[in-house]
Each structure stands twice: as structure tokens, then as C-alpha cells.
Amino acid sequence: MKPQELAKEVAKRRTFAIISHPDAGKTTITEQLLLFGGVIREAGTVKGRKSGHFAKSDWMEIEKKRGISVTSSVMQFNYQGKRINILDTPGHEDFSEDTYRTLMAVDAAVMVIDSAKGIEAQTKKLFKVVKQRGIPIFTFMNKLDRDGREPLDLIAELEDLLGIEGYAMNWPIGMGKGLKGLYDRVNQRIELYRREGDDRFLPLNDQGQLDPSQPLTQDSIYTQTLDDIELLNDAGNQFNLKKIMAGEQTPVFFGSALTNFGVETFLNSFVQYAPEPGPKKTEQGGEVNPTNPELSAFVFKIQANMNPAHRDRIAFVRIVSGEFERGMDVILHRTGKTMRLNNSTEFMADTRETVSTAVAGDIVGLYDTGNFQIGDTIYQGKEPIQFEKLPQFTPELFVRVTPKNVMKQKSFHKGMQQLVQEGAVQLYKTYNTNDYILGAVGQLQFEVFQFRMLHEYHSEVIMTPIGSRTARWINPDQLDEKMSSSRNLLVQDIHGDPLFLFENQYAERWFADKYPDVKLTAKM
């Protein structure tokens, strides 16, 4: 591809993640975006475990049974001349590490907030990561079809709790059963609730008001809306695209994903204002420009058994620069070895299509036989490239894990190996007995692991809790196996590095007093 063509294609890309607290409506709005992208004909909401109607973005069996997202899905479609890459992230807090890594692979984020509840705990955590990245954040205040909090309070909360300016792109005219429509400040029109086609839009005059002949003008809710708009214009934040690009101001859209109200207006604005792919920093201290003709990319996720019939493994790769072509040779930085990328795919949750070409900003799936690890960099060219490391959480909960049927050791070990490589749980082995110990941030990760071992590898496992522990790594040169006890269990991680799992802070303090010269670290 010629440089001009590459630059033109890269400029079409819009790659973003959707973040929210569980049950704020993240999966539902994802469905509606896919509907506008022409990918699906009917949007279905994730319902209870007894329901047979599941979301397109929730593909794993346990997600369908429990109505929660525990993996990051990737969905791609074309819209208004742009190539949209959506990464739908886990809403459950136990899977926040997967979400954090996903946020390293996007150029913008969409924050979905339940307008009845406002900003919740998980939203705060995820916002902090997005803020650190300095990427634009677009906010969708959801569930306007239900009674919720005052819109002015929701806007103020963005600044008070998250420290980011909010600019209301539209404004609700009523809510819940009294919802009449949205006052569109950008397009100077009113979008009526539950109307189809062009009939749902009413133009505003130069004073920002409806023609007096419109029935809505006689409603007190409309009058209240005009008062709110006047207050926003006089005392609210001014729209500032520069601040938005720096992650200092967030455009706020009100709507209802469930009733598909306000979603199209949001999508149109997002496509207009969201950034195209930008440069990415390297461990070497430089940065790689997306229009650099030589391919560079990094692995931000590994997923086993997206197609259980084939027991496959997919490495999710974000292209940072250049053009990807199926069959090309690249260098894997971690090993220094050249590898050929023969098998590649693009996604719609669990469905895939073979992809022959892709450019910077795109997400590509590479069939993996065990070559890749999360955080790996692949590149072309003579100069080695290693992108900045992805975040890794230190586990806090631990269990011993054994197969219930010792005759099924082969499937047990294969399942352990493949699921651990996805990064949701960490694997350790005890020093003397080689017992398997799993570490996780939350209990749900263990439940998902156990479920997948049984249903994907036909290996029933027994998990014996050893409780909440603090992991501390030790320099191998200072290690003496006699230091180990039940209170500070000596294990090794998948890289063979030794660490202690301390029962509590008293055990850690006792160890420090007994071995004052031994240096322990939170991460290796």
C-alpha cells in the first residue's frame, strides 16, 4: 500500500472501548451500535440465566448463563465511511485486569452511566486508567426511559468525583414515563421520543426554541428544559475539542440504549469527534507513528476456545503502525525469532472471518499454537521495537487446584496451560510438591475457571481455598527453602521465579524481622 493510501485508511479507523459499572447498560448500547453498523438485524438484551436470548457481544457459555460479561469481545463494522472497532470490556470487577489491558489497545473510551445511579465504584476505577492514558472519553447517560437523577446533578458529579469537565451535547426533556425527547444542542433540533424516521426531529429557531405551534411548547417540561439550556449556556462549560482530545473534557449524551433513543445521535457525534489512531510509546524511549509503513503491533489479550469444536487459541493484536498482510514475516521481540502470520481473523464476538489485510488501528486475531504471550510485540524492520508493558495485577485470593479424576491428567494439564495463558488467573507451583495453586483478584475468576475446565476440557477440578494472601517475590540468590512455612508458603510462578504467599501482614512482618537482609518485592 502506498504511503498516501495507508494514511487515508488509518484516518478512517475509530477504535474504542466501552466501560461501565455492571448493569449500567454497556452490552445493550453495544448491541444498538452494531444495529446501526448493519451487523445485526435485531438487538437483544442480556437477560437472566433462564432466558434464551443473549447478546451478540457475550459469546462464552458462562456469560450466556449468568448474564454477565467476563471477557473482552471485539466487534468490527463500517459506518459513514469509517471503520469502527469496538472492544466490549468485562463489567465485573473481578475481571478488571482484562479490562485494563484492553484499554491499552484503544484510542478512545465510551463511559456508560446509569442515570438513576450516577457514577459507581467500578466506573471510577476504570475512568482512572483511561485518564492516565490521556485518551478522549465520551459519556452516555443511559436509562433515560426510567426515572433518574437530575441531569444537572449528573453533570456536576463528573467534575466532583472524576475531576473531568462535562459538556452536555444534548439534554433530556423529561424522563421515565414523562420522557418527551432530547434537546440537541449541537444540531439545534429536538429529537422526539418514540417517533420513527425524520418525523422524530423538530428544528429549533435562532433563539434555540421550537415554533410556538408545536404542541410540545405547551408542556411545562419543555419550559423547564429551556431554563436548563439557558443555565448551561450561561454558566456551563464551553465545548472545547482540544480539551476533549486530551481527556480533560467529556462530551455527555443522554439517551436510552434499551429503547434505542439518542444512540444514533451519539454514534454520529462520536464518529465525527473521536480521534484516529495516534503514535505509541516504546520501551526504548521513542514512539511509533501509525503511518510508518513497517508493521508493528502488540498482543493485549489471548483467548482459548472461542471455537470449542477446534480447541483453538486466538491472540488479539492491536496494529500500531503499517499494514498487516496475511502470510507476512515478522519478528517476535521477546524471542528475537522470525515468524510467519499465516492464519488471521477479524471478529464479531464468536463469529469470525478470515482477514487478508488490516492497517494501524485495527484489531486482528492470530491463531496461536503457544508462541504468543500477553504484552508481546511483533514488528518488521531492522530496529527492534518493544511497546510499553501492559498492567498486571498481583492476585489476592489463592486456591489449590487438583483434578477430581486422576485418570484425566492430560485434559487437566492442557486446560490449566491454556486458560492460565489468558491472564485472568495466575498459576503457581509449590516448591517441594509441585502442587498447583491459582491466584486471582476476585472469586468469580475461580468460578469461571472451574466452569470452563469442566465444559471446555471435560476436566472436573477440586479447588481448596488457602485464603487471602500477599504475594512477595524474592531474589533467587537470597532464597533458602527453609524460609518456607504454612504462614509464608514458598512457590514459583510460571517463569520459575520464587515468591512467598504470606498469610497476613503479621506473617510478612515476622519474616522481615527474622531475615532483615532479604529483599522482597510486590512484582518481579
Swiss-Prot record:
GTP binds at residues 20-27, 88-92, 142-145. InterPro entries: EF-G-like_DII, EFG_III/V, G_TR_CS, P-loop_NTPase, PrfC, RF3_C, RF3_dom_3_sf, RF3_GTP-bd. GO terms for molecular function: GTP binding; GTPase activity; translation release factor activity, codon nonspecific; translation release factor activity, codon specific. One of its GO terms (cellular component) is cytosol. Keywords: Cytoplasm, GTP-binding, Nucleotide-binding, Protein biosynthesis. The keyword Transcription regulation does not apply. GO terms for biological process: regulation of translational termination. It holds the Pfam family RF3_C. SUPFAM superfamilies: EF-G C-terminal domain-like, P-loop containing nucleoside triphosphate hydrolases, Translation proteins. It is found in: Cytoplasm. The keyword Transport does not apply. Residues 11-278 form the tr-type G domain. Belongs to the TRAFAC class translation factor GTPase superfamily. Classic translation factor GTPase family. PrfC subfamily. PANTHER family: PEPTIDE CHAIN RELEASE FACTOR RF3 (PTHR43556:SF2). HAMAP family: Rel_fac_3. Increases the formation of ribosomal termination complexes and stimulates activities of RF-1 and RF-2. It binds guanine nucleotides and has strong preference for UGA stop codons. It may interact directly with the ribosome. The stimulation of RF-1 and RF-2 is significantly reduced by GTP and GDP, but not by GMP. This is Peptide chain release factor 3.
